[in-house]
Amino acid sequence: MSVPLILTILAGAATFIGAFLGVLGQKPSNRLLAFSLGFAAGIMLLISLMEMLPAALAAEGMSPVLGYGMFIFGLLGYFGLDRMLPHAHPQDLMQKSVQPLPKSLKRTAILLTLGISLHNFPEGIATFVTASSNLELGFGIALAVALHNIPEGLAVAGPVYAATGSKRTAILWAGISGLAEILGGVLAWLILGSMISPVVMAAIMAAVAGIMVALSVDELMPLAKEIDPNNNPSYGVLCGMSVMGFSLVLLQTAGIG
Protein backbone atom coordinates (compact mmCIF):
# COMPACT_ATOMS: atom_id res chain seq x y z
CA MET A 1 0.00 0.00 0.00
CA SER A 2 1.41 3.39 -1.01
CA VAL A 3 2.26 6.14 1.48
CA PRO A 4 -0.15 8.67 -0.16
CA LEU A 5 -3.00 6.19 0.22
CA ILE A 6 -2.09 5.56 3.87
CA LEU A 7 -2.12 9.32 4.53
CA THR A 8 -5.56 9.61 2.92
CA ILE A 9 -6.93 6.73 5.00
CA LEU A 10 -5.58 8.19 8.24
CA ALA A 11 -7.02 11.62 7.45
CA GLY A 12 -10.46 10.14 6.73
CA ALA A 13 -10.34 7.94 9.83
CA ALA A 14 -9.99 11.04 12.01
CA THR A 15 -13.74 11.46 11.54
CA PHE A 16 -14.24 8.62 14.02
CA ILE A 17 -12.48 10.66 16.71
CA GLY A 18 -15.09 13.37 16.35
CA ALA A 19 -17.84 10.76 16.28
CA PHE A 20 -16.76 9.32 19.63
CA LEU A 21 -16.62 12.81 21.10
CA GLY A 22 -20.15 13.42 19.83
CA VAL A 23 -21.66 10.45 21.67
CA LEU A 24 -19.77 10.53 24.97
CA GLY A 25 -21.87 11.15 28.05
CA GLN A 26 -25.59 11.88 28.02
CA LYS A 27 -27.79 12.38 24.99
CA PRO A 28 -27.19 15.87 23.57
CA SER A 29 -29.47 18.63 24.85
CA ASN A 30 -31.39 20.86 22.45
CA ARG A 31 -28.85 23.60 23.11
CA LEU A 32 -25.88 21.37 22.30
CA LEU A 33 -27.65 19.95 19.27
CA ALA A 34 -28.44 23.42 17.94
CA PHE A 35 -24.84 24.45 18.51
CA SER A 36 -23.56 21.39 16.64
CA LEU A 37 -25.82 22.17 13.68
CA GLY A 38 -24.57 25.75 13.60
CA PHE A 39 -21.02 24.46 13.97
CA ALA A 40 -21.50 22.20 10.96
CA ALA A 41 -22.96 25.09 8.95
CA GLY A 42 -19.93 27.21 9.76
CA ILE A 43 -17.58 24.46 8.63
CA MET A 44 -19.44 23.97 5.37
CA LEU A 45 -19.76 27.67 4.55
CA LEU A 46 -16.10 28.44 5.11
CA ILE A 47 -14.89 25.39 3.21
CA SER A 48 -17.24 26.09 0.31
CA LEU A 49 -16.83 29.84 -0.12
CA MET A 50 -13.24 30.37 1.02
CA GLU A 51 -11.55 27.19 -0.21
CA MET A 52 -13.43 25.02 -2.67
CA LEU A 53 -15.11 27.57 -4.97
CA PRO A 54 -12.07 29.89 -5.28
CA ALA A 55 -9.81 26.89 -5.89
CA ALA A 56 -12.21 25.58 -8.54
CA LEU A 57 -12.34 28.92 -10.34
CA ALA A 58 -8.55 29.27 -10.25
CA ALA A 59 -7.90 25.80 -11.65
CA GLU A 60 -6.02 25.56 -14.92
CA GLY A 61 -8.42 25.39 -17.85
CA MET A 62 -11.51 26.24 -15.77
CA SER A 63 -13.69 29.02 -17.16
CA PRO A 64 -15.82 31.22 -14.86
CA VAL A 65 -18.93 30.12 -16.74
CA LEU A 66 -18.26 26.44 -16.07
CA GLY A 67 -17.15 27.08 -12.49
CA TYR A 68 -20.15 29.14 -11.44
CA GLY A 69 -22.40 26.93 -13.55
CA MET A 70 -21.33 23.87 -11.59
CA PHE A 71 -21.78 25.81 -8.35
CA ILE A 72 -25.38 26.61 -9.33
CA PHE A 73 -25.85 23.01 -10.44
CA GLY A 74 -24.88 21.93 -6.93
CA LEU A 75 -27.37 24.37 -5.41
CA LEU A 76 -30.19 23.11 -7.62
CA GLY A 77 -29.17 19.51 -7.02
CA TYR A 78 -29.52 20.03 -3.29
CA PHE A 79 -33.00 21.49 -3.61
CA GLY A 80 -33.99 18.60 -5.88
CA LEU A 81 -32.84 16.13 -3.22
CA ASP A 82 -34.53 18.21 -0.54
CA ARG A 83 -37.89 17.89 -2.30
CA MET A 84 -37.54 14.11 -2.52
CA LEU A 85 -37.14 13.70 1.24
CA PRO A 86 -40.12 13.83 3.62
CA HIS A 87 -40.74 16.95 5.69
CA ALA A 88 -42.02 17.19 9.26
CA HIS A 89 -43.14 20.13 11.37
CA PRO A 90 -40.04 21.85 12.79
CA GLN A 91 -41.71 22.64 16.10
CA ASP A 92 -42.03 18.91 16.76
CA LEU A 93 -38.29 18.85 17.39
CA MET A 94 -38.90 20.71 20.63
CA GLN A 95 -41.05 17.96 22.11
CA LYS A 96 -39.43 16.19 25.03
CA SER A 97 -40.54 12.60 24.78
CA VAL A 98 -39.25 9.09 25.07
CA GLN A 99 -40.37 8.55 21.48
CA PRO A 100 -37.80 8.85 18.70
CA LEU A 101 -37.31 12.36 17.41
CA PRO A 102 -39.37 13.21 14.31
CA LYS A 103 -38.31 12.68 10.74
CA SER A 104 -37.22 16.28 10.19
CA LEU A 105 -34.18 15.77 12.40
CA LYS A 106 -33.44 12.38 10.85
CA ARG A 107 -33.80 14.01 7.44
CA THR A 108 -31.34 16.70 8.45
CA ALA A 109 -28.91 14.05 9.68
CA ILE A 110 -29.13 12.29 6.31
CA LEU A 111 -28.52 15.51 4.39
CA LEU A 112 -25.69 16.50 6.70
CA THR A 113 -23.97 13.15 6.25
CA LEU A 114 -24.49 13.36 2.49
CA GLY A 115 -23.18 16.91 2.28
CA ILE A 116 -20.01 16.20 4.23
CA SER A 117 -19.50 12.93 2.35
CA LEU A 118 -19.74 14.75 -0.98
CA HIS A 119 -17.14 17.19 0.26
CA ASN A 120 -14.88 14.47 1.61
CA PHE A 121 -14.88 12.41 -1.59
CA PRO A 122 -13.03 14.92 -3.79
CA GLU A 123 -10.99 15.91 -0.75
CA GLY A 124 -9.74 12.33 -0.54
CA ILE A 125 -8.76 12.49 -4.20
CA ALA A 126 -7.00 15.81 -3.62
CA THR A 127 -5.10 14.46 -0.61
CA PHE A 128 -3.91 11.40 -2.51
CA VAL A 129 -2.91 13.31 -5.64
CA THR A 130 -1.06 15.98 -3.62
CA ALA A 131 0.84 13.37 -1.62
CA SER A 132 1.67 11.48 -4.81
CA SER A 133 3.25 14.54 -6.41
CA ASN A 134 4.96 15.86 -3.26
CA LEU A 135 5.07 13.69 -0.15
CA GLU A 136 6.07 16.55 2.15
CA LEU A 137 3.08 18.61 1.07
CA GLY A 138 0.99 15.46 1.35
CA PHE A 139 1.82 15.18 5.03
CA GLY A 140 0.76 18.79 5.53
CA ILE A 141 -2.58 18.47 3.79
CA ALA A 142 -3.31 15.13 5.47
CA LEU A 143 -2.71 16.71 8.89
CA ALA A 144 -4.96 19.67 8.17
CA VAL A 145 -7.67 17.41 6.70
CA ALA A 146 -7.51 15.16 9.76
CA LEU A 147 -7.87 18.16 12.08
CA HIS A 148 -11.00 19.42 10.39
CA ASN A 149 -12.43 15.91 10.00
CA ILE A 150 -12.65 15.71 13.80
CA PRO A 151 -15.24 18.51 14.14
CA GLU A 152 -17.01 17.17 11.06
CA GLY A 153 -17.39 13.80 12.78
CA LEU A 154 -18.69 15.57 15.87
CA ALA A 155 -21.13 17.60 13.79
CA VAL A 156 -22.56 14.47 12.15
CA ALA A 157 -22.67 12.27 15.26
CA GLY A 158 -24.52 14.81 17.42
CA PRO A 159 -27.68 15.11 15.27
CA VAL A 160 -27.72 11.39 14.43
CA TYR A 161 -27.41 10.47 18.11
CA ALA A 162 -30.25 12.83 18.99
CA ALA A 163 -32.41 11.46 16.17
CA THR A 164 -31.85 7.76 16.87
CA GLY A 165 -30.70 7.52 20.48
CA SER A 166 -28.09 5.01 19.31
CA LYS A 167 -24.38 5.67 19.83
CA ARG A 168 -23.48 2.88 17.43
CA THR A 169 -25.62 4.38 14.67
CA ALA A 170 -24.20 7.86 15.29
CA ILE A 171 -20.62 6.58 15.03
CA LEU A 172 -21.52 4.58 11.92
CA TRP A 173 -23.05 7.55 10.12
CA ALA A 174 -20.18 9.82 11.04
CA GLY A 175 -17.82 7.12 9.85
CA ILE A 176 -19.59 7.02 6.49
CA SER A 177 -18.65 10.64 5.87
CA GLY A 178 -15.02 9.77 6.62
CA LEU A 179 -15.14 6.62 4.51
CA ALA A 180 -16.21 8.75 1.54
CA GLU A 181 -12.84 10.48 1.77
CA ILE A 182 -11.03 7.15 1.96
CA LEU A 183 -13.04 5.94 -1.04
CA GLY A 184 -11.94 8.99 -3.01
CA GLY A 185 -8.32 8.19 -2.21
CA VAL A 186 -8.71 4.52 -3.10
CA LEU A 187 -10.34 5.33 -6.44
CA ALA A 188 -7.59 7.83 -7.18
CA TRP A 189 -5.05 5.13 -6.37
CA LEU A 190 -6.76 2.54 -8.57
CA ILE A 191 -7.86 4.69 -11.50
CA LEU A 192 -6.72 8.27 -11.54
CA GLY A 193 -3.21 8.25 -10.13
CA SER A 194 -1.60 11.62 -10.78
CA MET A 195 -3.37 12.04 -14.13
CA ILE A 196 -6.66 13.50 -12.87
CA SER A 197 -7.80 16.42 -15.01
CA PRO A 198 -7.67 19.78 -13.19
CA VAL A 199 -10.89 20.81 -14.91
CA VAL A 200 -12.75 17.69 -13.77
CA MET A 201 -11.53 18.13 -10.21
CA ALA A 202 -12.46 21.81 -10.26
CA ALA A 203 -15.94 21.09 -11.61
CA ILE A 204 -16.54 18.53 -8.85
CA MET A 205 -15.37 20.96 -6.18
CA ALA A 206 -17.60 23.77 -7.50
CA ALA A 207 -20.69 21.56 -7.52
CA VAL A 208 -20.01 20.24 -4.03
CA ALA A 209 -19.50 23.80 -2.80
CA GLY A 210 -22.97 24.68 -4.06
CA ILE A 211 -24.51 21.70 -2.29
CA MET A 212 -22.84 22.58 0.99
CA VAL A 213 -23.86 26.26 0.88
CA ALA A 214 -27.49 25.34 0.20
CA LEU A 215 -27.49 22.75 2.98
CA SER A 216 -26.03 25.20 5.48
CA VAL A 217 -28.33 28.13 4.73
CA ASP A 218 -31.57 26.29 3.98
CA GLU A 219 -31.38 23.40 6.44
CA LEU A 220 -28.81 23.57 9.22
CA MET A 221 -29.08 27.16 10.42
CA PRO A 222 -32.92 27.39 10.38
CA LEU A 223 -33.26 24.04 12.15
CA ALA A 224 -30.73 25.07 14.79
CA LYS A 225 -32.84 28.14 15.56
CA GLU A 226 -36.05 26.09 15.68
CA ILE A 227 -34.58 23.51 18.04
CA ASP A 228 -33.25 26.13 20.46
CA PRO A 229 -35.03 29.47 19.85
CA ASN A 230 -33.55 30.99 23.02
CA ASN A 231 -30.01 30.97 21.65
CA ASN A 232 -28.49 32.34 18.48
CA PRO A 233 -27.14 29.63 16.14
CA SER A 234 -24.64 32.19 14.87
CA TYR A 235 -22.36 31.32 17.80
CA GLY A 236 -22.06 27.76 16.53
CA VAL A 237 -21.55 29.04 12.98
CA LEU A 238 -18.75 31.36 14.10
CA CYS A 239 -17.07 28.60 16.11
CA GLY A 240 -17.24 26.23 13.15
CA MET A 241 -15.75 28.88 10.88
CA SER A 242 -12.98 29.59 13.40
CA VAL A 243 -11.97 25.93 13.73
CA MET A 244 -12.04 25.45 9.99
CA GLY A 245 -10.14 28.67 9.45
CA PHE A 246 -7.40 27.36 11.72
CA SER A 247 -7.20 24.22 9.60
CA LEU A 248 -6.88 26.32 6.45
CA VAL A 249 -4.06 28.30 8.06
CA LEU A 250 -2.25 25.00 8.53
CA LEU A 251 -2.75 24.30 4.84
CA GLN A 252 -1.25 27.66 3.92
CA THR A 253 1.63 27.16 6.34
CA ALA A 254 2.35 23.87 4.61
CA GLY A 255 2.51 25.77 1.32
CA ILE A 256 -0.69 24.28 -0.10
CA GLY A 257 -3.30 26.98 0.49
From Swiss-Prot:
Its main location: membrane. InterPro entries: ZIP, Zn_transptr_ZupT. It is found in: Cell inner membrane. The chain crosses the membrane at residues 5-25, 32-52, 61-81, 137-157, 171-191, 195-215, 236-256. One of its GO terms (molecular function) is zinc ion transmembrane transporter activity. Disulfide bonds: none annotated. Keywords: Cell inner membrane, Cell membrane, Ion transport, Iron, Membrane, Metal-binding, Transmembrane, Transmembrane helix, Transport, Zinc, Zinc transport. Fe(2+) binds at N120, E123, N149, E152, E181. It catalyses: Zn(2+)(in) = Zn(2+)(out). Zn(2+) binds at E123, H148, E152. Pfam families: Zip (PF02535). Coiled coil: none annotated. It is a multi-pass membrane protein. The keyword Metal-binding applies. GO terms for cellular component: plasma membrane. Mediates zinc uptake. May also transport other divalent cations. Belongs to the ZIP transporter (TC 2.A.5) family. ZupT subfamily. PANTHER family: ZINC TRANSPORTER ZUPT, ZINC/IRON TRANSPORTER. This is Zinc transporter ZupT. It comes from Escherichia coli O127:H6 (strain E2348/69 / EPEC).
